[in-house]
Amino acid sequence: MTAILERRESESLWGRFCNWITSTENRLYIGWFGVLMIPTLLTATSVFIIAFIAAPPVDIDGIREPVSGSLLYGNNIISGAIIPTSAAIGLHFYPIWEAASVDEWLYNGGPYELIVLHFLLGVACYMGREWELSFRLGMRPWIAVAYSAPVAAATAVFLIYPIGQGSFSDGMPLGISGTFNFMIVFQAEHNILMHPFHMLGVAGVFGGSLFSAMHGSLVTSSLIRETTENESANEGYRFGQEEETYNIVAAHGYFGRLIFQYASFNNSRSLHFFLAAWPVVGIWFTALGISTMAFNLNGFNFNQSVVDSQGRVINTWADIINRANLGMEVMHERNAHNFPLDLAAMEAPSVNG
């Protein structure tokens, strides 16, 4: 009998740990995905903060011209960034122990790769943790599905794009002005504004903002009055109440008359699915667009597509954008190459007499 009790005790230690990890009674749900999420996100966050404050300049282009990104090296919150790993490293896995010294690792931008890889693993686990908690509570899995959109976008700019371009130095810098620089260079090299998937992403983000504002304002305008004129309307709601807090019939009637009848949802469930799906699908397409442009399947090129009867070019806005792209391409990485890639790739004129 004693032996049986001891075996149960030894089994229960692991069992208690499993129950604690997967318990929905904890103040914050951990879950098995959380076991990996917590250390990876803590690592990414810690290294980001330290590097943003104190990292030395990084030779991002691999031409012995380091770029400063940290606060202690002259930057402010706007101009500061974690500089991407050097082009000299390319796509090589570059942990600290692969460098000859910590100084070399910092000079070649090792912190960027460390932060990005831990961050992507962490947010993927966060998405898995959302699904896991939904599963434990008997909920549907759509919260994790919605979160997959920003996860896909982050993976596209931090991992897929560098893979397609052949170097982590082409990844998005971790900072405000660095993000803007990434966007400008991306437009110059890939003409993203003329890519249909980017257009769908813009429609998703702006449309989602519009629909969110419309829904919130309609609900707020059709609340069922539960308070006096001297009280806040918000005091009329009690958490967990069974009664509707707004009149969906009134909201439906208002919006149907404002635009037309079938523009208004008469089903609350389909309405909220639409509100979730619109921006999520748009951001999915944007991430897919970044991932295709990573391998140089670029936006539409309508340059010099309109000519008159004499064959002379009539400039369109596409030509104006192309001129701006060339200018931006000339100005970035000025010392890394002498000509924009589009011009450098042109066939050389014949010099034969």
Curated annotation (Swiss-Prot):
CDD domains in the cross-refs: Photosystem-II_D1
EC annotation from Swiss-Prot or TrEMBL: 1.10.3.9
Family matches, as Pfam families: Photo_RC (PF00124)
Domain of life according to the entry: Eukaryota
Topology relative to the membrane: Multi-pass membrane protein
Positions annotated to bind [CaMn4O5] cluster: 170, 189, 332-333, 342, 344
Record-linked InterPro entries: D1/D2, Photo_II_D1/D2_sf, Photo_RC_L/M, Photo_RC_L/M_CS, PSII_D1
Site (Stabilizes free radical intermediate): 190
Residues binding chlorophyll a ChlzD1: 118
Keywords associated with the record: Acetylation, Calcium, Chlorophyll, Chloroplast, Chromophore, Electron transport, Herbicide resistance, Iron, Magnesium, Manganese, Membrane, Metal-binding, Oxidoreductase, Phosphoprotein, Photosynthesis, Photosystem II, Plastid, Thylakoid, Transmembrane, Transmembrane helix, Transport
GO biological process annotation, one example: response to herbicide
Gene3D superfamilies, per the entry: Photosystem II protein D1-like
Binding site for chlorophyll a PD1: 198
Signal peptide as annotated in the record: none
Record PTM Phosphothreonine, positions in chain: 2
Subcellular location: Plastid, Chloroplast thylakoid membrane
Miscellaneous note of the record: 2 of the reaction center chlorophylls (ChlD1 and ChlD2) are entirely coordinated by water. Herbicides such as atrazine, BNT, diuron or ioxynil bind in the Q(B) binding site and block subsequent electron transfer.
NCBIfam families: psbA
Family: Belongs to the reaction center PufL/M/PsbA/D family.
Record-given protein name: Photosystem II protein D1
Species: Phaseolus vulgaris (Kidney bean)
